[in-house]
């Protein structure tokens, strides 16, 4: 047996124990095995997770382990799992070990990077807070993202998480000329498939790299896929000096797969059955998502909240890292207002006069106050009707309804379905529009003119057309 070869001594589902004669592979080192199942040649990559003593290691498989038997020869790679990086990954789908899985010509990468890397040091990190303009009115106004920040995207099934993700990818590609990386962490294969074809239709595929480790895969693949995607994003930040957008769908599944791996490795669980290292594992991933003096990685992470319990250790460990939250609300979607972002529930760390300026802060808080007052008046309106309100309250209700409508916006990626052309609204236009509504400049314009438009100029044109017709 060659020095770097070992043999399998035990297979426990996705966990494989291997014994080496003289060589001891390091933690996180990759192991390779080629074997045959029912006449089909298969290759499997494993990652060393623990040293058991006496040249024995316990490794986590990155794919199914059926067909493995004891005494099979397994080879240490002498390095970690490495994945392709660079512009050649754009428009392609990869699995956790960096193989293309989109049935196109297999990629022969000219450059690969290991998936486990150090987070940027304090000296490398950029400390200035800069707003990241998305072109989506409700986000830029009420819960702005910061460059290199982390955003939690909360929402149930079918309220439009994917559409917002696609619109952000589109806007980053066309307005900031940047790239995006999408990591599908333990989500449905069907959703991954839909996303690929929707991106193809929406024309954003050539600006994004997709990495999928879906629900049906072993915990090792579901956990490490987040690092695969992050490594691709880090290349664009560190080597190309770009501002990259990184999507993780779903960050809860990263914690969940970590809990499965932890149990398989025989570690004693902590609260609610999660791994004892939950906070550390979450930090290891999140700390790599940062702004450096070269470029930035801004991440949008979809967060599934099990049983709507925000105190569950997994979502709670994510909250500690988030700079902004974008909450999608089904009630808003039912009104036909898209994006269905809840203007009162969504938050941002940078929504303060020091960070975004006095004007933006005043307009944003003014809008929230009007919407909150409208929410408080809902019960009175339901019981007594609008006529019983004071003149001032009637004005508040009118303005709030206009604001609600004006928070809707036609998306570029939804053009195919809605037929209305998408709109990118600059922050300047957003502030001008909402500031004008608060000042009462547009009290004479019917509220329907505010629905599904971009800037306030379009509202005025729409109102003019409505009047003429």
Curated annotation (Swiss-Prot):
Membrane topology, as annotated: Peripheral membrane protein
CDD domains: ATP-synt_F1_beta_C, ATP-synt_F1_beta_N, F1-ATPase_beta_CD
Enzyme Commission (EC) number: 7.1.2.2
GO cellular component, one term: plasma membrane
Keyword Transport belongs to the record: yes
Major localization listed first in the record, in broad terms: membrane
Source domain of life: Bacteria
Binding site for ATP: 155-162
Pfam families: ATP-synt_ab, ATP-synt_ab_N, ATP-synt_VA_C
This protein's UniProt keywords: ATP synthesis, ATP-binding, Cell inner membrane, Cell membrane, CF(1), Hydrogen ion transport, Ion transport, Membrane, Nucleotide-binding, Translocase, Transport
Entry function: Produces ATP from ADP in the presence of a proton gradient across the membrane. The catalytic sites are hosted primarily by the beta subunits.
Family statement drawn from the similarity comment of this UniProt entry: Belongs to the ATPase alpha/beta chains family.
Protein name (record): ATP synthase subunit beta
Organism encoding this protein: Helicobacter pylori (strain ATCC 700392 / 26695) (Campylobacter pylori)
